[in-house]
A protein has these predicted regions:
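A short hydrophobic alpha-helix cap/turn motif
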Residues: 42-44, 57, 85, 98
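Alpha-helical segment proximal to the catalytic Tyr-Lys
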Residues: 40-41, 103
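Short, flexible catalytic-loop segment of classical short-chain dehydrogenase/reductase
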Residues: 15, 49, 53-64, 118
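C-terminal helical subdomain
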Residues: 51, 70-105, 112-114
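Active-site loop immediately N-terminal to the catalytic Tyr-X3-Lys motif
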Residues: 16-22, 45, 82, 100
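Residue(s) in the substrate-gating loop at a strand-loop-helix junction
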Residues: 11
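Active-site helix of classical SDR
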Residues: 27, 35
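Short C-terminal tail/terminal secondary-structure segment
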Residues: 106-132
């Protein structure tokens, strides 16, 4: 029998650092590298290990950010898709990585971030039309 799936949640802050968040950035980068090392060590046992890195996501943890509209909007504008993600969108990726369909995926870092990690930061993405 054997085998299995491990899906770890980190953050886009572990891929691209955020200002004034040194400890958080470091912790999330460590989680990503922990998962990559585990993927290598557990592959012989047919256990896959992958990381999901959410970007700005509407959750209980981010509720306070909505109380500061200029911060919330600044983060929204930094997302190329021009919106925050939902917990359901993150969960869908986790469900896939935990499924048999992902049996050949291991050591992957999967951003679920509306394109934040695709942006080098050199240019801000253009605003999408309001009806998008």
């Amino acid at each position: 029998r054997g085998g299995g799936r491990i899906v770890i949640t980190a953050s886009t802050s572990g891929i691209n650092a955020d200002p004034n968040m040194w400890a958080y950035n470091t912790a999330k980068a460590a989680v990503i590298n922990l998962a990559k090392g585990a993927a290598l060590d557990l592959a012989a046992d047919a256990i896959t290990v992958n990381v999901v890195c959410p970007g700005p996501t509407e959750t209980g943890m981010t509720t306070g950010i909505k109380q500061v509209p200029e911060v919330y909007e600044s983060l929204r504008r930094a997302v190329p898709l021009q919106r925050w993600g939902t917990a359901e969108e993150v969960a869908a990726v986790i469900v896939f990585l935990a499924s048999q369909a992902a049996s050949f995926v291991t050591g992957a870092i999967v951003p679920v971030d509306g394109g934040i990690t695709a942006n080098t930061g050199q240019f801000m993405p253009r605003e999408l039309p309001a009806d998008s």
